[in-house]
Amino acid sequence: MSRILKSLSRSYSTTSPRLYVDVVQGLYISSLKSYKPKAVPSETAAEVKEWSMPSAPTAPKYDVDFTSALNSYKYEGETIPTKAAGESNKFDFLESYENEKEH
């Protein structure tokens, strides 16, 4: 007898969460439809400043003569250090070696 009651109770069960979702959704939609935004008072319009275009920037003017400054600089000597005859570089393995035998 208990097997029959269990099978009958399963067939008559309803899903209450679906009904709950519809009620909540209905309340939410009705509150959205009834919403009316507040009117903006004219006082807030006075608080906003009018936008004006900024003035165009001007190029700076210097009193220095750049040509004479560049001519006064002269490249003197070699500034790149050279390696000694027996000294090896840690990046020597990156150099490509030429194959003496032709294919």
UniProtKB/Swiss-Prot annotation:
Keyword Coiled coil belongs to the record: no
Subcellular location: Mitochondrion; Mitochondrion inner membrane
Main subcellular location: mitochondrion
Keywords: ATP synthesis, CF(0), Hydrogen ion transport, Ion transport, Membrane, Mitochondrion, Mitochondrion inner membrane, Transit peptide, Transport
Disulphide bond pairs: none
Keyword Ribonucleoprotein applies: no
Matching Pfam families: ATP_sub_h
Transit peptide residues according to the UniProt entry: 1-26
UniProt GO cellular component terms: matrix side of mitochondrial inner membrane; mitochondrion; proton-transporting ATP synthase complex
InterPro entries reported in the protein's UniProt record: ATP_synth_F0_suH (IPR019711)
UniProt-listed GO biological process terms: proton motive force-driven ATP synthesis; proton motive force-driven mitochondrial ATP synthesis; proton transmembrane transport
Subunit description: F-type ATPases have 2 components, CF(1) - the catalytic core - and CF(0) - the membrane proton channel.
Function recorded in the entry: Mitochondrial membrane ATP synthase (F(1)F(0) ATP synthase or Complex V) produces ATP from ADP in the presence of a proton gradient across the membrane which is generated by electron transport complexes of the respiratory chain. F-type ATPases consist of two structural domains, F(1) - containing the extramembraneous catalytic core and F(0) - containing the membrane proton channel, linked together by a central stalk and a peripheral stalk. During catalysis, ATP synthesis in the catalytic domain of F(1) is coupled via a rotary mechanism of the central stalk subunits to proton translocation.
Family: Belongs to the ATPase h subunit family.
Protein name: ATP synthase subunit H, mitochondrial
Organism, scientific name: Schizosaccharomyces pombe (strain 972 / ATCC 24843)
Gene: atp14
